[in-house]
Amino acid sequence: MKIVARTIPPRSAWMLEQAGVHPLLARLYAARGVQTREELDDGLARLLAPDGLRGAHEAALLLADAIRDDKRLCIVADYDCDGATACAVALRGLRLLGAKHVSYLVPDRVVDGYGLTPPIAERVAATGADVLITVDNGIASVEGVAAAKARGLAVLVTDHHLPGPALPAADVLVNPNQPDCGFDSKSIAGVGVMFYVLLALRSELRARGVFDLPAAAGPPQGGRASPSGGGEAHEVASRGVGRPQPKLDVLLPLVALGTVADVVKLDANNRRLVAQGLRRIRAGVMPAGVAALFKAAGRNAAAATTFDFGFALGPRINAAGRLADMTLGIECLTTDDSARAEELARMLDGINRERRDIEGGMRDQALLLAESLFDEDGSETPRAAISVFDADFHEGVVGIVASRIKDRYHRPTFVFAASGAPGKEHELKGSGRSIPGFHLRDALDLVAKRHPGVLLRFGGHAMAAGCTVAEEHFETFERALAQVAAEWLDAASLTRRLDTDGPLAPEYLRVDLVDTLHREVWGQGFAPPTFSEEVEVISQRLVGEKHLALKLRHKGQPVDGIWFGHTEPLPPRVVIAFRLDADEWQGVRRVRFLVEGAEI
């Protein structure tokens, strides 16, 4: 591991500090590309306008007509947290905006596979639906959309995944990554895309006179033209014609949760969405299911952080899609009955505990399989890419295990399990996680071109992807992916690099400052503050057989530390990378270091 301090543009840090930003925060923000205080404004008026998202206006027209004509809408969702929150946002939002007949369907991960397939389209048609809406999927569903259209359904695809060479022939496509879309936030999650469609729909309904413009409202979307093209004058003219306009900001806690849990890049617009959601949760304004999930996870909603989304609530919702039925997660997020929400949250918590047990066994076996590859090569270091398969692996957990192996060896990693779908027993379904510099979906595309027929299906992003191969072709895939990785990745890329914010002055070891840092929005692409320093190790001991508890001396001051998931002892003096945390003991809160890595 190589610990590297980020470059801090001195002028940006100085300008932020002069604008009143705390010196430490100014340094952290500048290192993440922030140059002015205005960029930190997380007000709703600073959100990008829906009219910049290609297809949003057309989606609004389609949905407004469907609501006017009392048509039946059916949402087809993905089975992860982004898909569940997107489905919940769609259900709640469409009902708020006047839709009377809205249902949903989530494919079974094992039986149905991912996304809108022809069989799923048939099931939607059988419900009597008139309009099919995908959330967090659909951009690759060429055959599924065709099947839905053949059954007479209108199809609205809302997605954020990268498109393939052919786009589905949907009535409307809304995806920031589709060709010719100029929307500035290419990293918006599926739940964010659906939220933007609802904003556009509300504006269209307002333009039609269905809703009043709120009396205190100014120009829509922070002074920008409305998605209907009417502008401020049209909106003001429509006031008093219809019923009060529904508030869509009640959906922001769900948008924030799905955005963080999907590990999309937290660009400026995503950070604003997350900040707005956190603000409402901390104030106690959230769906009953979100409150219940905080309670089930033992987390304090009044002090909610992005960590809670990514490591407490998100995994509990994801567990339903991995091991059970994501309808549990969606029902939890859509019910307004607090008692029912708590019951569902407890069920999700139990499923997540089961997931942890399965994951632990799979992780240990996957590590053994990965290490056996070293022996085959006669090397003490892994291949440029790792692919492992075991007949006993559970396909609902392969993605998590791939992430663990990737973190352990700093290699692009795929973990495969046998398909449980009827008639597909000889297919292997794999989930992959990558490292910086290796675009996983592009790598799969190259493997497919070099070895036609090996990949039955594939898709995904730069850092995460999925694919299906015939069992007989697994070794071919394994070698082919490793070959692509060997060509694309050099020695520096294959060395784990931990970027930090450099040394930390002793005066910043304060609990109140730790709380300030925790309240900020951190995540993918806007990394949580991590510092690096040489420290003296006073004492160390194992806790729970798998964590290293430390007594350290940092610039002459004693401080406690903990390295979760690490058991090897540290030398007397060592450079560590660490995050700040506040630990409480006997009613007293103290700063401690959460160790992320060490140069040993």
Protein language model features and the residues they cover:
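Acidic-glycine-rich active-site phosphate/pyrophosphate-binding loop
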Residues: 65, 165-175, 290, 552-555
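Hydrophobic helix-and-loop "lid/oligomerization" segment in the mid-to-C-terminal part
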Residues: 6-130, 151, 203-220, 224, ...
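A short acidic, amphipathic alpha-helical/loop segment
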Residues: 143-147, 401-404, 512, 516
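Short, ordered loop/turn segments at secondary-structure junctions
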Residues: 78-79, 107-110, 137-138, 160-163, ...
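Mid-to-C-terminal polyanion-binding domains and interfaces
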Residues: 65-69, 338-388, 422-426, 438, ...
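A residue-level signal for conserved active-site and pocket-lining positions in enzyme catalytic cores
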Residues: 29, 133, 318, 516-517, ...
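Conserved phosphate-handling catalytic cores of large alpha/beta enzymes
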Residues: 125, 134, 138-216, 245-261, ...
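Non-catalytic interface/linker regions that flank or bridge core catalytic/transmembrane domains
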Residues: 2-3
